[in-house]
Amino acid sequence: MGRRGFLMAAGGAAALAGCGGMAAREDLPFDAWDNHCHIGGGPGKTPAERVDNLLKLADRVGVERLCLHLGLQIGVEDPPPEQIRQDNDAVLEAVRFAGDRAVGYVYLNPNHLDFSLKEFDRCVRDGPMVGVKLWVAKHCNAPELDPIVRRAAEQKAVVYQHTWMKVGGNGPGESTPFDVVELAKRHPDVRLLCGHAGGDWERGIRAIRSTKNVLLEIAGSDPTSGFVEMAVRELGADRIVYGSDVHGRSFASQLAKVRGADIPDAAKRLILRDNLRGLLEPIMRAKGLL
């Protein structure tokens, strides 16, 4: 049963209006697509319950579509194949429940390359997922990433790489924006998403500036004054993608980075919606999701 059917069964049209369902959403200015959402954390025992809670929050702040990845258990840095499959199954369940409000990115581990390529085929080529999530198992400049990027490009799937630059040093397999640049230069026709702007966003912005096929994702840090303004100035608004990293962060604090930035409204629309929609549109249309 999908989310709408669940709400109807729980109380009919009145329930839809009362808990942020379709009737209540019609008057909201849905202007954001969120690249970075997790069903790990937050209330609910099942993937369906957790994504339903996320959508109720999204309804309140004007987020139209969620990109889900990683599954219910977040924190296993180098997961074995069985864990990866469980995580992806949880996202598949959440996406089925959410209907047209959510899409999924397949979580892959380059340390298990053969399995990861098969998992990509299961979830993306032969399934409903539309992108790839790479986290901290292996530096993304490693050669094992090349087959994954090529497979994603064949299906026009988005490739998202977590990045950070930690004061105390990154984890053993944790990538930086500089690693993403190395990978991007080996695949100049593929557009890559550099997650979290590297954490240290001033360095992250400069690191990717000259590599035009790398886009900056701004999820998961405090809404610091000047962050988005600098990114627009150095990269152009067409290379920036909004994400929240909910439940790790709130929708509201992350939207505030863009909605409160001193940039034109046209730039805000690109960042909040149009850039991500443009990346996803080819594969979503091919799958009948748009």
Give the location of each predicted region.
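Mid-to-C-terminal alpha-helical segments outside catalytic/metal-binding sites
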Residues: 4-31, 35, 48-65, 121, ...
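Histidine-centered catalytic micro-motifs
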Residues: 32-42, 160-163
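Divalent metal-coordination and catalytic microenvironments
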Residues: 36, 104, 132, 152, ...
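Acidic/histidine-rich helix-loop elements
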Residues: 38-49, 75-82
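Active-site beta-loop-alpha junctions enriched in small/polar residues
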Residues: 38-40, 71-73, 107-111, 135-137, ...
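Active-site gating/metal-coordination segments in enzymes
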Residues: 64-65, 78-167
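Catalytic pocket-lining loop regions of alpha/beta-barrel enzymes
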Residues: 127-131, 138-241, 286-290
